Amino acid sequence: MSASKIPLFKMKDLILILCLLEMSFAVPFFPQQSGTPGMASLSLETMRQLGSLQRLNTLSQYSRYGFGKSFNSLWMHGLLPPHSSLPWMRPREHETQQYEYSLPVHPPPLPSQPSLKPQQPGLKPFLQSAAATTNQATALKEALQPPIHLGHLPLQEGELPLVQQQVAPSDKPPKPELPGVDFADPQGPSLPGMDFPDPQGPSLPGLDFADPQGSTIFQIARLISHGPMPQNKQSPLYPGMLYVPFGANQLNAPARLGIMSSEEVAGGREDPMAYGAMFPGFGGMRPGFEGMPHNPAMGGDFTLEFDSPVAATKGPENEEGGAQGSPMPEANPDNLENPAFLTELEPAPHAGLLALPKDDIPGLPRSPSGKMKGLPSVTPAAADPLMTPELADVYRTYDADMTTSVDFQEEATMDTTMAPNSLQTSMPGNKAQEPEMMHDAWHFQEP
């Protein structure tokens, strides 16, 4: 019995495994997006689902580069060619573009330049002479008898007032006399009216003048009807605007590389700044290139580093030695030789302020050498370490009870919620008097 039951259970297990395999092949674990196969094509709805700037608080599973850094695309890893060559970025004719980037609907034709057919019944909005010339041009086009006009108009010069008085009330049966009648009709009683038909006798200058005018009016009307068409060829090259801000976050990777439509950037510059106050690595997710900080030294977590180019060459053991406050002369090479280094340090977190790390201050531009621009110089040790009265009104201040050396202030490994208690920088001569153990209530002590 047991020998016969074992293959039966094996068969049942095999059937179960096969059923599970069939189900696993049927259920799409990795659903294919609609688009060009093999390309990372994302529609606007998918980008909205992946996360937008209005949903920053959700910790994104699509990104390992920070808090709200959803949708890090393949451009970051260099796996995709630039977007100009991607077929899903090219415009498709049947696709409806976004409203803010599509050109407006064809405007109605201007009242001064419509097509010539509705001009003839009402001549009120136009000058009489211009209406008469266009009327004559259309009537001559309808008549199509230029040799008859060349013969007839000089013969009828003397009888023009009589013909005008006789033919005007009738329903225009004689076609050759129609241009002369219509032209002299508004200007019959006046002398310029008699002067105008005289050069029209040979009628060549009149014809040569009226025909291009009518054709230009037709061309203008045609251009109005087809108004924004040549620009429509170039407008959908970028269906959604491309925001590529390079911001410094915790790993100093590009903060967000991808296609963002303008509807998803409603927050703009204001919304991420609240997160910049909470998380110091979160500066600079903004649709622009101008305010992005650039970290010269690749920083891991929230570590204060020097802003000088020497920081890129220092090893981590020097940083640890400086962080423990031991008097190491090689840990701070700028201190003795370059006293002007004090003027480059950042004085922004005053005594007791909850401060952002040095390299992640969001709004300040940098010079090409990596130095902060727009910061005031450090107050020397003899000056008042407290804040300005405006800052003291806003923030609660604490006493600066001890002087901290520059390398300790700059290189202390800092928790996200802690700040150095004293930012009063000591002069370079104080290096020998540095204490081995820093008794500071605002730092976590190592055991």
From Swiss-Prot:
> What is this protein's tissue specificity according to the annotation?
Ameloblast-specific. Located at the Tomes processes of secretory ameloblasts and in the sheath space between rod-interrod enamel.
Task: Supply the alphabetized keyword list.
Answer: Amelogenesis imperfecta, Biomineralization, Extracellular matrix, Glycoprotein, Hydroxylation, Phosphoprotein, Repeat, Secreted, Signal
Task: Give me the glycosylation sites of this protein.
Answer: 112
Residue list for modification Hydroxyproline: 37
A single GO CC term for this protein reads:
endoplasmic reticulum lumen
Q: What is the effect of changing residue 11 to T?
A: In ameloblastoma
In the UniProt record, the signal sequence range is 1-26
GO molecular function per UniProt = growth factor activity; structural constituent of tooth enamel
Compartments (UniProt record): Secreted, Extracellular space, Extracellular matrix
PTM sites of type Phosphoserine: 43
Gene Ontology process terms (BP): biomineral tissue development; cell adhesion; odontogenesis of dentin-containing tooth; regulation of cell population proliferation
Give positions of region: Disordered. 165-211, 307-338, 353-383
Q: Which InterPro entries match?
A: Amelin
The sequence repeat units are at: 189-201, 202-214
Which disease does the UniProt record connect it to? Amelogenesis imperfecta 1F: A form of amelogenesis imperfecta, a disorder characterized by defective enamel formation. The enamel may be hypoplastic, hypomineralized or both, and affected teeth may be discoloured, sensitive or prone to disintegration. AI1F is characterized by hypoplastic enamel of the primary and secondary dentition.
Q: Which PANTHER family match?
A: AMELOBLASTIN
Q: Which family does it belong to?
A: Belongs to the ameloblastin family.
Record function comment: Involved in the mineralization and structural organization of enamel.
Name of protein: Ameloblastin
Which organism was this protein described from?
Answer: Homo sapiens (Human)
Q: Source organism lineage?
A: Eukaryota, Metazoa, Chordata, Craniata, Vertebrata
Which gene codes for it?
AMBN
